Amino acid sequence: MLPAAMKGLGLALLAVLLCSAPAHGLWCQDCTLTTNSSHCTPKQCQPSDTVCASVRITDPSSSRKDHSVNKMCASSCDFVKRHFFSDYLMGFINSGILKVDVDCYEKDLCNGVAGAGHSPWALAGGLLLSLGPALLWAGP
């Protein structure tokens, strides 16, 4: 059996992991005016950012359907929409020259390529939860 002090330490570590908030904020893909999403890079957002946004600007009149992609951290989806649907752009949107699509997500790297990344806290938590009982109740 493990000494009582080691069991106590194991329980304390488990409690800290389960009860603490992650030390990092949201992670989003980040790029500006690119035509290829693979040029976007992961970025750690500010604590005030709550969504990852993906904005696609398309020229519907183009036979090639030219488009540009903007991906970013944002405080809210409404903030992104206000920015991209500003008075300046609304003239182009209303006249059919541009089409703007805004999508927002609340999970890490959801505005990028599928499977782009996972939270290190999820990995640490899964590892500790799977090893925790073995450490606490292991025999000599």
Curated annotation (Swiss-Prot):
SMART domains: LU
Gene: LY6H
Annotated localization: Cell membrane
Predominant cellular place of this UniProt entry's protein: membrane
Subunit structure: Interacts with CHRNA4 and CHRNA7.
The keyword Cell membrane belongs to this UniProt entry's keyword annotation: yes
Stated role: Believed to act as a modulator of nicotinic acetylcholine receptors (nAChRs) activity. In vitro inhibits alpha-3:beta-4-containing nAChRs maximum response. May play a role in the intracellular trafficking of alpha-7-containing nAChRs and may inhibit their expression at the cell surface. Seems to inhibit alpha-7/CHRNA7 signaling in hippocampal neurons.
UniProt xrefs under Pfam families: UPAR_LY6
Glycosylation sites: N36
Organism: Macaca fascicularis (Crab-eating macaque)
Protein name: Lymphocyte antigen 6H
Highest taxon listed in the record's lineage: Eukaryota
Protein's GO biological process: acetylcholine receptor signaling pathway
GO MF term (any one): acetylcholine receptor inhibitor activity
Annotated UPAR/Ly6 domain residues: 26-91
PANTHER family: LYMPHOCYTE ANTIGEN 6H
Membrane topology, record value: Lipid-anchor; GPI-anchor
